Amino acid sequence: MKREIVIAFVVLHYKNMRDTLECIDSIRKLNFSDSYHIVVVDNDSCTLEEAKVLQEKADDFVQAQENLGFAKGNNLGIEKAKEYSPSFIAVINNDTVIEQDDFVNRIKKDYQKYRFDALGPKIITNGGESVNPFPAYKTKKQVEKAIRKSKQLISIYRSKCKRFLLRVYIRLKHILKKPKPLENGKCFQEDVSLHGCAIIFSRKYYKKYHDCFYQGTFLYHEEEFLELRRTKDRLKFIYDPKLEIFHKEGSSLNYSYNDNLYHKLIFREENILKSLQLLKKLMEEKEG
């Protein structure tokens, strides 16, 4: 008979063993009395030795037969977590670290008060900025503008000449325009879009939907598909800055502008473009 689980953590692993192990260890070190469960999903990136290590570290280790991307990979882990019928499922990036001992207690208190479907924590980054609440695109006009921008970036990244001009533009922009102080994420908010790198689903949410994340995307903009679901089904999404998690990446990227980087950026933008085009299609279907 399976023990009663208060919270299940789903961690999606892809190649970076150090981050994944630090993420798991941060959960294990937390001083809370509630029973918890850790599910690690490998997106078809582990060697046999790495898989063995993750099997030992996690409570459940699920190995995908191919790289499923963000949404499908996490949904695979969530399906495993559902077997334990936890009160909450926390889906967190493998490059996040939890250091807050009352993390689970805070989630429980928020649920008792708000009966949320999804909860987003304050996501602390190296740059000091909070990426929650997430500024999701909410209109077709915004999505169309983002599609045009994505196409432009793909064109720039494929041209050495355009890449050089982009570097000059960015450097001048940083010299001439001082960055504004970031104000996002200071106050508790309801009915907001939440960042996908750390999101807590309640039991009532994951029982309502077969797939917690929309299955159609590979990478990027999963938040907008959650936002469509939130508005359509009038779900309760809340953001609590008193609940905290550290995200190693954040938005403070140190660009080195080499050819390998641009291959990665092209891959990134191509997947962003696919997600945005799909989002636009769903918005049009909703209108019609």
Where are these regions (language model features)?
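A recurrent flexible, glycine/aromatic-enriched loop bordering the glycosyltransferase active site
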Residues: 159-167, 181-201
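A conserved acidic beta->alpha catalytic loop
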Residues: 40-50, 66, 93
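Short beta-strand-to-loop acidic/aromatic patch adjacent to the donor-nucleotide binding site
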Residues: 86-97
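A short, conserved alpha-helix in the catalytic core of glycosyltransferases
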Residues: 192-243
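Short, well-formed alpha-helical segments that are part of the catalytic scaffolds
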Residues: 16-30
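Conserved donor NDP-sugar-binding/catalytic core segment of glycosyltransferases
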Residues: 100-134, 139
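Glycine-rich, basic loop-to-helix element that forms the pyrophosphate-binding segment
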Residues: 64-81
